[in-house]
């Protein structure tokens, strides 16, 4: 409630614009978030904005595409900070980034970060301004999956310093954990992609992968 006066909440009956001042707040220390709760009467009395999205697109899909882009940016920042720390931190007379074990962890981080970056770009690709649901599923699933691995490796390399309040790494990794769950975790979006393959596609798995990941037609259209 320090920034927003109202929040748009999606529930079983649709969407409601709910004032933050009327909510019961519960601080969530792990992610530096606040959990907001409203009564059923408050939800029924709140205005329901008329949000019309094209092509059957729902708010969760739109939100997931945006959060995937946020995750990709945060993942890159965590990786760059960790790489810089590994080059600066001296142990046994040389930077810890010279040790093979640290180099291996950095290499794995890099794979996750750049895979998430490409997936997030795929989630934003399309012929219009609104994302395609299956591409968003790929983007959010891959970025959420990377969040766990990158946060774990970053804190392993930083050691205890990464958890301190004075060091900004924990601000970024808290966001990774929070955004991983926002609009559906990787498990949810894996299910969306699987359902598209089983129920909504007549060709082979490879055909679906090609049609989903090939953005050249969108660029030339």
Where do the model's predicted regions map?
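FAD-binding core of flavoproteins
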Residues: 1-80, 206-212, 216-221
């Amino acid at each position: 409630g320090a920034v927003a006066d109202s929040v748009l909440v999606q529930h079983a009956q649709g969407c409601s614009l709910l004032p933050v001042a009327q909510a019961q707040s519960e601080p969530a220390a792990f992610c530096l978030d606040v959990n907001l709760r409203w009564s059923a009467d408050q939800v029924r009395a709140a205005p329901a904005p008329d949000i019309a999205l094209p092509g059957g697109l729902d708010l969760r899909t739109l939100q997931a595409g945006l959060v995937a882009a946020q995750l990709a940016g945060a993942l890159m920042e965590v990786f760059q900070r960790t790489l810089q720390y590994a080059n600066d931190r001296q142990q046994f007379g040389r930077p810890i980034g010279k040790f093979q074990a640290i180099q291996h962890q950095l290499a794995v981080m890099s794979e996750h970060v750049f895979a998430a970056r490409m997936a997030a770009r795929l989630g934003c690709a399309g012929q219009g301004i609104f994302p395609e649901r299956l591409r968003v599923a790929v983007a959010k699933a891959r970025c959420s999956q990377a969040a766990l691995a990158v946060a774990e490796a970053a804190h392993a390399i930083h050691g205890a310093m990464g958890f301190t309040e004075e060091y900004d790494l924990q601000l970024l990794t808290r966001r990774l954990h929070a955004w991983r769950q926002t609009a559906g975790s990787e498990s949810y979006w894996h299910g969306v992609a699987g359902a598209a393959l089983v129920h909504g596609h007549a060709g082979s798995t490879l055909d679906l992968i090609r049609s989903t990941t090939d953005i050249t037609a969108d660029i030339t259209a």
